Structures are given as structure tokens and as C-alpha cells.
Swiss-Prot record:
Gene that encodes it: mauJ
Pfam families the UniProt entry points to: MauJ (PF17419)
Top-level division of the source organism's lineage: Bacteria
Name recorded for this polypeptide: Methylamine utilization protein MauJ
Pathway in which this enzyme or protein is active: One-carbon metabolism; methylamine degradation
Length: 287
């Protein structure tokens, strides 16, 4: 089963359903704690190349109104591993959106200051008033057991598409995933397998894109490419330059879901194209 690689489309409750329901129905402004796990995208370690004591450091960041308290914590190696913000908001989602924007701006400043790679690996949210908690971290799937003997080698004309698909699956962010996966879809548009392709509910579920079901389910490949084109084109600025991404979490979540869908569709189509070229089984006793 394919698992979406991007974490921004989901928020998993960690408290009983009744507790979560009380928090969601309460729209009064109150304090939320939003913690962010931090990651080095080069080493993939959940730590940054910034020295911070395990006891933590207290900072103040510019907020929508007054400064926001930021507490950063180091791991056992003394490297920055988690940042926690206190946010006053009417819901967990609003608190996350505000905290994400504030921390991302601070993180970008550290990237420029240090020249080191930095990214948000996941987050957790607490509503102390209702003792409700949520978490969002990458899912780690189990190992697969391919049938190496039965595999058909890649034909030379499919190698460039497979390389693009590799870039999509290895992409460190949704924008890179969208650009690479979209290129695969366009490269397979005129292949025979394209005629049988349709976006299914299962694909939307795996991509975390069910909120786009009405506009995407049932689309053929040409229609899917057309639906993804505006999101793809927003990633490229005039003159063919790479465009800066929106710092709005909702916009990033939409991009992540559609990039996941493009990636998933590219995988299905590429695998189908390979299998159409598999030699027919030889009858028993054939030379």
C-alpha cells in the first residue's frame, strides 16, 4: 500500500474522542501549546546543527499581536530537536496555522544565518483547557518483499521517466514532488496505459486528498493533468525561475495533497506501462 510522504495533510488525535469533541466545539480563545519536531533534511536526523542545552532556551518571536514565547530544546547530543510555542487561539487548527507561520519565519532566518539545512519534521498540539492532544509525524511503513526474479528490466525509453519518479519519491518537499511527478504524468499522457487510467476514491484516500473528491474522482489522465496544472505552474515564476512557496499552511497542505496524488498516479501509470511489456507466460513444456 502506498503511504503519502508529506505530513501536512493530517492531524491525528491522541486523546479520547469525547475530549477531542469538547475541544473542537469550544470556540473561545484560549492557550494552546504547539510543539514542532525539527529535522536535518541532509542527514534525515531529527535534530538541527544548532547547539541548545537539553534544559532549553526561552526566546520571544514577533507574533500577530504581542511577542510569542518560544521554547527550544536540545536532544542528548545537545542539538536543537524541538521548538514549542504558546498560542492563544479558538481551535487547534488555528493555533497550528499561526504557530507554523511564526516558526517557519524563524527557521528560515536560522537557515540563512548558519547555512545549514533545516525542516519541520512533524508537530504536536495540546489544548490544556480540555486536556486534548493531537500529533502529526511521518508514517514509517514496513519493509516490502519484491519478487526480484519475476521483475522485467526497465526498457531504455522508460528510464528517464523512472528517474523522474525517483526524484518525486525522494523529494524533500511537496513542491519538488509535484514538479517531478507532474513531469512523469505528462510523459505518459500519450502511452497506451493512459486510456485506462481514472482517479479513484482509493487513490484520493491514500493521497490524503478526499476533500478534493468532487473535483478529482473519475478524471482521466488528461483531465488530471489539467486539474494539477495551476498548482504546478504556481511553482514556476516568470522567466522559468523557481517561485517561492506560500508561507500559508492551508496553501501548503493543498499542495501536499495534490503532489501526493500526482506522485501516486505517476507510480500506478509507470508500473502499468512496465507490465504491459512483460513477456507472456510460456505454456508448459515450451522450449
Amino acid at each position: 500500500m502506498w503511504i503519502p510522504y508529506d505530513i501536512r495533510g493530517s492531524l491525528k488525535p491522541e486523546s479520547p474522542a469525547g475530549t477531542i469533541r469538547l475541544s473542537r466545539t469550544d470556540t473561545s480563545p484560549r492557550e494552546f501549546l504547539v510543539g514542532f519536531f525539527l529535522r536535518n533534511p541532509v542527514t534525515q536526523a531529527w535534530e538541527l546543527d544548532i547547539a541548545v542545552p537539553a534544559s532549553g532556551l526561552e526566546l520571544a518571536l514577533p507574533g500577530p499581536g504581542s511577542p510569542l514565547p518560544l521554547r527550544i530544546y536540545g536532544n542528548e547530543a545537545g542539538k536543537l530537536a524541538e521548538a514549542i510555542l504558546r498560542i492563544t487561539a479558538p481551535s487547534a487548527e488555528t493555533a497550528l496555522a499561526q504557530a507554523h507561520g511564526v516558526l517557519q519565519a524563524w527557521l528560515l532566518r536560522q537557515v540563512v544565518e548558519t547555512g545549514r539545512g533545516m525542516a519541520i519534521a512533524g508537530w504536536r498540539i495540546a489544548d490544556p483547557a480540555h486536556e486534548a492532544r493531537w500529533r502529526c509525524t511521518p508514517f514509517r511503513p514496513s519493509a516490502m518483499s519484491p519478487d526480484f526474479v519475476a521483475q522485467v528490466p526497465l526498457a531504455p525509453d522508460l528510464l528517464p521517466l523512472a528517474e523522474l519518479f525517483q526524484r518525486a519519491r525522494n523529494a524533500p518537499d511537496a513542491a519538488s514532488r509535484m514538479l517531478a511527478a507532474y513531469a512523469v504524468l505528462c510523459g505518459l499522457r500519450d502511452r497506451p496505459v493512459a486510456s485506462d487510467f481514472r482517479v479513484t476514491q482509493e487513490m484520493l484516500i491514500h493521497a490524503g486528498a478526499m476533500e478534493h473528491q468532487a473535483g478529482l474522482q473519475g478524471l482521466d489522465l488528461a483531465a488530471l493533468i489539467a486539474a494539477l496544472r495551476p498548482e504546478h505552474d504556481r511553482l514556476i515564476a516568470p522567466g522559468g525561475l523557481l517561485a517561492a512557496l506560500s508561507d500559508d499552511l492551508a496553501a501548503q497542505q493543498r499542495l501536499a495533497r495534490l503532489a501526493n496524488l500526482a506522485d501516486l498516479a505517476a507510480h500506478r501509470l509507470l508500473l502499468a506501462q512496465i507490465r504491459t511489456r512483460a513477456p507472456a507466460p510460456q505454456p508448459m513444456g515450451a522450449a
